[in-house]
Amino acid sequence: MTAITGVILAGGQSRRMGGEDKGLLQLHGQPLYQHVLQRLHPQVDQLLISANRNLSQYQLSGVEVISDSLPDFPGPLAGMLSALQAMKTEWAAFCACDTPFIPRDYVVRLCQQKGNAHAVWVRSVQRDHPALALLHRDLAGPLEDYLLRGERRLLHFLLQEGGHAVMFPDDESAFSNINTPEELTSLGAR
């Protein structure tokens, strides 16, 4: 199998969390991004964290931290673009920092089902999860053009580039992301 960079997307503004940096919120005594890191690290060859604030706290993990090359937090696509431009491998597996329960075979399953596509993402029983995606570095140019046109719709971009979903009929909670303080409290009680 080809080398893959795992990328934790932690660069958002977290408006529904009152502006707190979601990746640094605590779940079971450790930051959310650390839960993702522990699940993603064994599945990839290299790691990056895409963050736009609290960089020194993310750097404590020992993982290379990159920031968006485009200003003003233009969404997860900006973090994906920065990672595609910075990575040294052909492929990147992306995870949002607030998805602490991704499957331990997430990357291999995406790789097995990608075929000739340059983009694949998770589809659970309930919905698509386009921020949980495997992208080829050749998408950096088209993605930059897309963002410079003012576009921000992640799933639209992936479809436009010929990508397809990969079905993950796992427990839906494997793809739960944490958007509110109430959701974090609920997960902490498990």
Where would I find each of the regions flagged by the language model?
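Nucleotide and nucleotide-moiety/phosphate-recognizing core
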Residues: M1-E151, H156-F175, E182
